[in-house]
Amino acid sequence: MFYKLLLKKNNLDGFIIPHEDEFLTEYTPPSSDRLHWITGFSGSAGMSIINERNAVIFVDGRYTTQVKMESPSEFFDFEDLSIERQKKWIRENCKSGYKLGFSPKIISSTKFKFLEKIANEESIELVECKNFVDQIWLDRPNEPNGEIIYHEEKFSGKNFKDKKTNLLKVLNKEKVDSLFISESDNTCWLLNIRGH
């Protein structure tokens, strides 16, 4: 299959495909739903590791039935998304010297620390690379670029100014100088904006 050529071309033994997008959101737009495109699985939480011999999809308990209906069992193993099951699968399928590729743009720091820890324990090399799916997804939908709209106070419950004032009170009480908000849904909530 095509993925074997990409693995060989990039000198990798396997590649990680998480569900999350560049904003690490649970609900991704169609243009960022890489896991769905490559596996057929349409749930909102999961991760796949694909290598030359086999592949796995990790999903949480909400999706154990759904993943078996949507993804081909002749190609994918199905596992629980728990850290222990991920460790077990990696230990059994990624031997010493294994080169495991990942796109740093769509892996959280928490996930990276987990992968780094198990890579060190098992002598696996983590390799930053371009996203495999993006290289082969020729009919990928366009990224959303709809206009930003104001979410009226009658829907949000509070205007931005009041939210900001309350947030500053909490920061002052906790003696915090600043707050970095990286999740887009939190930014939208604070600013009372939405988009499509």
Describe each model-derived feature in a short phrase.
Residues 100:
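Ligand-binding face of N-terminal immunoglobulin V-set domains in extracellular IgSF glycoproteins
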